């Protein structure tokens, strides 16, 4: 006991023991926070996580988290299947950064399948389906193949097929400055080849490739027939992108794509699976329908090795129906996206934080991972979505401004560089005719009308808007910034992994606090003028 004038203080060394005298810990546990009878429906801005004890560096935090029952990502970030967000470029770079991109379906089945192939061919361990040409293939045709697939270095076999005798390789250097486009590649190809024999493991093959200083290493059988390849560029990518999301067997990038629940989507899915698809997302604003349940059961029967993510859902009742049908993951959110007006127009939906907690806590009992889809405007929202039980978060508007998104870049009236972005429920998206080949029946094939059950409507009711978002630079800088911010947030909470975060939220170790309107104002910037740089 210490005395200071008229004040008597406790011994400072007893602080931890005195703390135990308090009946309640600071803040709220997750159940008190999410009690809708007391709090109502909550959004991400309505609460904060309270800090814990930091006993480790942020670099020690791991972000591994499942997106489906069978597939785990090293970065829990997913790009949305919107036609101004995710095509093959976005899907490739999201996968390279440890996340995954979901390719939209507001295009023809063949176009979507081509995008899947580009993702799967981008980075390989053993390339089991290389692009093979014959001696008679022209230089012009080889250049066209390079333009189409985005890579060069084509093996030449007698028949032009895998399994045929290898006779040479055409590299970029062989055709780069060749002006005679009709010349057969037999006149320019490399015939002095370094190869490896079938049965070699990936580590040994990579060593041979590194020592050979060649760009490609063909793998042949005892008869000299081509069976597979490995690429030097993939070795480089492995060094630059150690977190890349890859399949365990082929070492190809993981690729996801969305489809609808119409009968013709079964044919679309068959083409996507043939192209190498790993995950299919059933794209609907309201997933608890007879159409989606029937589609889930059909997919699990026809393609048992394909992971299926159902949704969207915001209640336990919706989730239960899809879990019972056999989904491998769920997508949570209705009306919370930045370009979505479903809650306003339809008066149906749910505040995102409340939806994520209620659905994910129920789905966790069945081992079904959940994606928090919508309402993500910053790193803090990502943290909150994961703290409420989601395994990953899906982003649309936050990624639409990146270089890799397919949206059009332009200068706004204010002189700022922006990119076009639209909700799939917007009139612009629902009237897009690419999916139907531009025909008069294109509305029936449109991804937007399918998502919002409007294929046969004579009057389209918008559930989204069109606009623009600020240009954010490359995914290769923006996603690492999001991941670094997430690690520092978990460090502040005293959590070393997302699994630990989920466990400590459930057992009450991680605490929360409701934010009043004044508290939200206090937590923002309060300056006359300022410049907000997100990362450097």
From Swiss-Prot:
From the UniProt record, give the pathway where this protein acts. Answer: Purine metabolism; XMP biosynthesis via de novo pathway; XMP from IMP: step 1/1
The entry marks the following residues as binding K(+), namely 335, 337, 340, 522-524
Q: Entry's InterPro entries? A: Aldolase_TIM, CBS_dom, CBS_dom_sf, IMP_DH, IMP_DH/GMP_Rdtase_CS, IMP_DH_GMPRt
So which cofactors does this thing need?
K(+)
Q: Which residues form the active site?
A: 340, 451
Q: Report the PROSITE patterns cross-referenced here.
A: CBS (PS51371), IMP_DH_GMP_RED (PS00487)
Q: Mention any Pfam family matching this sequence.
A: CBS
**Activity regulation per the record?**
Mycophenolic acid (MPA) is a non-competitive inhibitor that prevents formation of the closed enzyme conformation by binding to the same site as the amobile flap. In contrast, mizoribine monophosphate (MZP) is a competitive inhibitor that induces the closed conformation. MPA is a potent inhibitor of mammalian IMPDHs but a poor inhibitor of the bacterial enzymes. MZP is a more potent inhibitor of bacterial IMPDH.
Specify where it is mainly localized: cytoplasm
Keyword Nucleotidyltransferase belongs to the record:
no
Provide the residue positions that the database annotates as binding IMP.
338, 373-375, 396-397, 421-425, 463
Q: What does this protein do?
A: Catalyzes the conversion of inosine 5'-phosphate (IMP) to xanthosine 5'-phosphate (XMP), the first committed and rate-limiting step in the de novo synthesis of guanine nucleotides, and therefore plays an important role in the regulation of cell growth.
Under which name does UniProt file this protein? Inosine-5'-monophosphate dehydrogenase
Which organism is this entry from? Neurospora crassa (strain ATCC 24698 / 74-OR23-1A / CBS 708.71 / DSM 1257 / FGSC 987)
């Amino acid at each position: 006991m210490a005395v200071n004038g008229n004040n008597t203080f406790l011994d400072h060394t007893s602080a931890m023991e005195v703390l135990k005298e308090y009946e309640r810990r600071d803040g709220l546990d997750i159940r008190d926070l999410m009690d809708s009878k007391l709090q109502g429906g909550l959004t991400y801005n309505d609460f904060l996580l309270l800090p814990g004890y930091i006993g480790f560096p942020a670099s020690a935090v791991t972000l591994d988290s499942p997106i489906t029952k069978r597939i785990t990502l090293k970065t829990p970030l997913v790009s949305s299947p919107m036609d101004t967000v995710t095509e093959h470029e976005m899907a490739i770079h999201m996968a390279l950064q440890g996340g995954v991109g979901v390719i939209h379906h507001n295009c023809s089945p063949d176009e979507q399948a081509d995008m899947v192939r580009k993702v799967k061919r981008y980075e390989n361990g053993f390339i089991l389906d290389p692009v093979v040409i014959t001696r008679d293939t022209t230089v012009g045709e080889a250049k066209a193949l390079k333009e189409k697939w985005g890579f060069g270095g084509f093996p030449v076999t007698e028949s032009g097929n895998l399994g045929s005798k290898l006779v040479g390789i055409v590299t970029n250097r062989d055709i780069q400055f060749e002006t005679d486009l009709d010349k057969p590649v037999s006149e320019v190809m490399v015939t002095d080849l370094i190869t490896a024999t079938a049965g070699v493991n990936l580590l040994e093959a990579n060593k041979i490739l590194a020592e050979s200083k060649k760009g490609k290493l063909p793998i042949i059988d005892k008869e000299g027939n081509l069976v597979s390849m490995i690429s030097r560029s993939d070795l480089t990518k492995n060094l630059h992108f150690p977190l890349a999301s890859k399949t365990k067997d082929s070492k190809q990038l993981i690729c996801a794509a969305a489809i609808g629940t119409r009968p013709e989507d079964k044919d679309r899915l068959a083409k996507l699976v043939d192209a190498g698809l790993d995950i299919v997302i059933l794209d609907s604003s309201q997933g608890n329908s007879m159409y989606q349940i029937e589609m889930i059961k059909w997919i699990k029967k026809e393609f048992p090795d394909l992971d299926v993510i159902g949704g969207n859902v915001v209640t336990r009742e919706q989730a239960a129906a899809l879990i019972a049908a056999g989904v491998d993951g769920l997508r949570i959110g209705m009306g919370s996206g930045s370009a979505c007006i479903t809650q306003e127009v339809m008066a149906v939906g749910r505040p995102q934080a409340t939806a994520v907690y209620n659905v994910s806590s129920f789905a966790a009992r069945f081992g079904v991972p959940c994606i928090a889809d919508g309402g993500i405007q910053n790193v803090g929202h990502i943290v909150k979505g994961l703290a409420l039980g989601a395994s990953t978060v899906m982003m649309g508007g936050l990624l639409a401004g990146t270089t890799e998104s397919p949206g059009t870049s332009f200068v706004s009236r204010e002189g700022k560089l922006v990119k076009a972005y639209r909700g799939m429920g917007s009139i612009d998206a629902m009237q897009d005719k690419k999916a139907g080949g531009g025909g008069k029946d294109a509305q029936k094939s449109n991804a937007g009308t399918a998502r919002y059950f409007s294929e046969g409507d004579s009057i389209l009711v918008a559930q989204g808007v069109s606009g623009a978002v600020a240009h954010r630079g490359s995914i290769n800088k923006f996603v690492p910034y999001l991941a670094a911010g997430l690690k520092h947030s978990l460090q502040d909470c005293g959590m070393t992994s997302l699994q630990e975060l989920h466990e400590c939220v459930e057992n009450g170790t991680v605490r929360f606090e409701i934010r009043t309107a004044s508290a939200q104002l206090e937590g923002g910037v309060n300056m006359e003028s300022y410049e907000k740089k997100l990362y450097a």
